[in-house]
A protein has these predicted regions:
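Short N-terminal signal/transit or membrane-insertion segments
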Residues: 1-2, 38-40, 45-55, 138, ...
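Active-site HxH/HxHxD metal-binding segment of metal-dependent hydrolases
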Residues: 1-37, 127, 131-135
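Polar low-complexity intrinsically disordered regions
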Residues: 2-11, 59, 84, 180
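Intrinsically disordered, low-complexity segments enriched in small/polar residues
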Residues: 7, 18-21, 38, 55, ...
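Proline-rich intrinsically disordered, low-complexity coils
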Residues: 19, 27-29, 46, 81, ...
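Flexible, acidic/histidine-containing loops and adjacent segments that form or flank the divalent-metal
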Residues: 24, 30-32, 36, 89, ...
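Metallo-beta-lactamase
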Residues: 41-132
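Accessory terminal helices/loops
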Residues: 93-180
Length: 180
């Protein structure tokens, strides 16, 4: 903000916008380590669920994991060949791998919410995901929300330390939609 309280970070000139250009997507294997120089490595660990190709990044030098958004399952878009990765089940499977490596992680930075939290939050989230997988309808809260002009029922399973995993019954399991 400037001295008059205006948010100067929302002001920009058209010349500030980077023009679009074609680029090549280069896939990386699970566990790929980016060498940032001087032996400083950051490892990509799949942590899908919120988005189909999401990774967490483990900073091996500082023992910090940057998880991105892991607060729920993302939308499954029709025709998306990776839609099954936007499920609670996928997040649950990937989170098991991350939690098995807690001895390498001292702190985590999620995509939003609390910052610089202890790695124990990963264990607490896995506990919440376990509860969802056992009984998706037994949520801590259920409410109707409007998304893109459509009503949907949103479920939430609380995570110890003050947040929740949000989902709906159509994006819990990978292969077959959840049916009552």
């Amino acid at each position: 903000f400037d001295e008059n309280g205006r948010n100067i970070y929302t002001e920009f000139d058209r010349r500030d916008i980077i023009p679009y250009r074609d680029y090549e997507l280069i896939p990386i294997p699970t566990g790929y380590r980016f060498d940032l120089g001087g032996g400083y490595e950051v490892e990509a660990i799949p942590l899908r669920g919120h988005s189909a190709g999401q990774c967490a990044y483990l900073d091996h030098h500082n023992h910090i994991i940057f998880t991105g958004d892991i607060g729920g399952a993302g939308r499954k878009y029709e025709g998306d060949p990776c839609a099954d990765n936007c499920t609670i089940e996928t997040l649950w499977r990937d989170m098991q791998v991350v939690v098995s490596r807690l001895d390498e992680i001292e702190a985590m930075f999620p995509g939003h919410g609390m910052l610089d939290v202890t790695s124990s939050l990963l264990r607490y989230e896995l506990d919440a995901l376990d509860r969802i997988m056992k009984n998706p309808e037994n949520a801590d809260s259920i409410k109707t929300v409007v998304r893109n002009g459509q009503e949907q029922v949103q479920y939430a399973m609380n995570i110890h330390q003050g947040t929740a995993v949000k989902y709906n019954l159509t994006n819990v399991f990978r292969q077959t939609p959840y049916r009552r």
